[in-house]
Amino acid sequence: MSKNLFEECEKCLHDEPAASTAWCPVHVDVPLFASEMEKGDFKKAYQVLEKKIPFTGIIGMICDHPCEKACVRDKLDRAINVSELERAAVRYGYTPFKKGPSMPKKKGKVAVVGGGISGITAAFELDRKGFQVTIYEQSERLGGRVWDYEGKRISREAIEEELQIIERLGIKVSYDSRIGEEELEQLTEEYDAVYLGTGEWEKGLYIHPDTFQVFDSPLFAGGRLYDKSGSVIYAVSSGKRAALSMERYIKKISLTASREREGSFETSLNYQLGDVEPAPRIEKIHDVYTEDEAVREAKRCLKCRCSECVKTCSHMQKFNVTPKGYGRQIQINESVIMGTRYANKMINSCAMCGLCAEQCSLGIGMKDLIHETRESMVEKSKMPPSAHDFALKDMEFSNSNRFFMVKPPPGDKKAEYLFYPGCQLSASCPEYVEKAYRYLLSSVKEGVGIMLGCCGAPADWAGRKDLMRESIERFKNVWNETGKPAFILACSSCIGIFEKYLPEISYVSLWEIFQKYGLPETAKPEHRHILNIHDACGTRHKKEVHESVRKLASGLGYEIEELKYAKDKTKCCGYGGLVYYANREQAIDFAEDRIRESKADLLVYCAMCKDLFVSQGKRTFHILELIFGENPEDAARKKMPNLSQRHANRAGLKTRLLRELWGEEPEMELMERNELNLVIPQELWKTMEERYLLLEDIEQVVARSRISGERFFNPEDSSYLASLRIKNVTYWVRYAEKEGEIHVISAYSHRMEVVKE
C-alpha cells in the first residue's frame, strides 16, 4: 500500500490546537475549558486550568490573557472573555491543592533565585520532576509582584493559601537571601542547575529563546529577565520551560530537541466562521461574572476544531473517526496476521465519494486510501466475502449473455456514438432507456449504436483488480471493434470509471446530448414547482454535466433551488462504494442525511440516487421521468424494483430491443426460466431483499429438489425443506405444494457447505 496516503492522513488538522490554545504560552485547552464552563461545571473547568497552570487560584485571577488576541471570534465580533471566565472558574470552582504521591528524589539538586511568579513556577515544576529544590528569596515572603494585585483582583487570604503549596510540597525556602554576582557563582558550583527569576539583574544576560539557558552554563533565567513586557502568564511559561531545560541539562540530553511548539505559536488550524452568527460579549455586572453570565459567555466560544470533513460525512460521524484516526486504524487492521480485523466493516462502509477531500483545506481525502486498502484486503484474502458478494454477482449477471449486448444502429448504419445506459438505470427504469435510445436514433444523425452491460464500478469499489481489468479490456475491445465511437453515458458511476480507467475513449453525457440536439417533442415546458438538485457524486468535477441537467430542468419549467452541498461539494446517496450491500444501516444514514438537507422535491440523474431516496420516503424525480414520463408527478414516489425485478428488467430490456429494433430473437440462455408457479408472500419478499435472495435462486432450489427428490418432508404441515449450493452460497427454501401452486414459506442462505456422505 502507498506510504504517501498514510502520510497524507497524518497531516489531518483535526487535532491541531485552537488558535487561542496555541497562542496561550502554557497552552490551556481553551475550547475544553469553555465547554466545561458552558455546562456550568466550574470545578471541572478549574481542573482544566490546573493541568497547565500552577498556583491556579492566583494565576487564574490575574492572567493577562494573550489568548484573546488570537481568538477567531474576534474576526466576527469580539473575542471570548477568557480572562473573566478564568476568574469565574476560580471563584466558583476553586479546589484546594492536593499533594500527590511523593516522588523519589532524583540525584540532583537545584536552586531557584527569586520567589516571584516565574521562580515559584520553576520550583513547583522541578519538585514534580523529583529534584531537591531550594528557593532563595530576598524578602520575607514569596510571590513577588503577585502582591501588587492584592485587594484589586485577588484577596490577601487567597494569595497566602496558594503560596502555602510551596511549604506543603516540602520545598526549602531561604528568606532574606540577597543573591549577587558572587553568590550566584557559588550557587552554580554548589547546585546542578540554577534558575534566576529576580525580575532585574545588574549584569546583562544572554538567555537562549528556546531553552532559557544563560550562555553554556548551569544557569537558566526567565520571567521579566527574559520578557520585559511583565506578562504574568509568560512568566509562568518561562518558569515551566526553564524547568524542563534544567531537567534535560542535569540528565545530559538535548536541550533543544522536540521543542518546536513550546510557548506561543500560530496553529495550522484555519477555522472557518462560515455561518456563525454574531453574538455580543456578555458584560459583567459585578467584579466577577455571575454563574449565569459565565455560562452565557462560554457559549460564545466556537470550540475551534477542524471537523469540516466529519461535519459533512455520515460515515465518519457514525464511526467517530477523522482522517488521521482512520489511517491509523487501517494500518493496525492491515498488520493483523492472526485474529479479527475489527476495522473491516468501517473500511467497507465508506462511500468513496471524495467529499472529504473537497471539504479539507489541505485536500486530504479517504477515497484513494480506502480503495487501496480494499485491494490489499482482497489480495491477502482478508476481505469478508459477504461484503460485496451480491454486488459482484449482480455485475456478473449484467455482463452475461442475459443482459450484455453490443449492437450497431438498426440497418447496420455506421455509428459515431455508442449509447451506454449502464446497468442500474436499465434495472430501475428500463422503459426510459428504451425511449432514450429511440430518441437518439431519431435525433443524432451521426448514428448511435448501443451497448448494454456493467462498467465494472462494483469491482472497482470492491477492490477486485482482476475483475476490473476484465471490464476495461471488454470496453477497449468493443470500442476498437465498433470503430472507436464516442460513448454516450447516462450513469454517473460509468462516467467515473471512464475518467479513471479509459482516458483514451471520448464520451459525453446523455444530458449534454439532450441539450445539444433538443428535447423530444413530448417533453413540453410548462410552469411547474421548485426542485432541489442532488448531483451524483460520480460527477463531482463534471461541470458540464451539472450545468446541462440544470438547463434541462429549467427548460422543462422547473425552478431550481440549490442545496448547500451541491456540484463539486455534493454528498453521496448511500450506494457509492457498495455501502448499500456492505452496511445497509450506513447507506440509510447517508440517504437520510441528504434528505434532511432538502426542503423541496429532489431531482437526480442517477438511478440509484432516485431509488434510495424514494425508499426513505422522499419524493424524487429522475431527469428522464421529467423528459419522457407521461405523468411525472406520479413518478416522484415510484419505488425501486426489488432485486429479482432488477434482473428481470435488464433481461426484458435486451429482449424488447432485439425484437423491436432488430427483429431478432434472444438466445436460449436469455429466455430460459423454470416453469414454476411460485407464490411468495409480501413479507417474504421483504426478507429476501434484506438477505439478498433472488427469485431465480428460489426457483433453482425448488426445481432441483423436485427433480432429484433431495428434500426433507414435514408431515405436520406437508411442507418440504430443500437446499442447493450455487457457487459459494448454500440456499435453503421451505415450501408447500398446493393445487398446482408452490407456496414458499421461508428462505435463507449461508456460506457453509453441507457435505453429503
Enumerate the language-model features and the residues they cover:
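Short, charged, surface-exposed secondary-structure boundary motifs
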Residues: R145-V146, L205-I207, Q515-T522, K571-C573, ...
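Ferredoxin-type iron-sulfur electron-transfer modules and their immediate structural context
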Residues: M1-S102, A193-S349
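Ribonuclease/tRNase effector modules and their secretory precursors
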Residues: R637-Q645, N649, K654-E757
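Cofactor-cradling patches in redox/metallo enzymes
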Residues: E150-K152, Q424-S509, R540-G557, E561-L657
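C-terminal amphipathic alpha-helical segment
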Residues: L519-G555
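Local cysteine-cluster metal-coordination motifs and their immediate loop/turn environment
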Residues: E7-P31, F55-L76, K299-K318, N348-G363, ...
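Conserved beta-strand elements of the Class I
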Residues: A111-V113, F220, L418, N532, ...
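Iron-sulfur-cluster electron-transfer modules
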Residues: A34-D192, G197, N320-P503, S644-R659
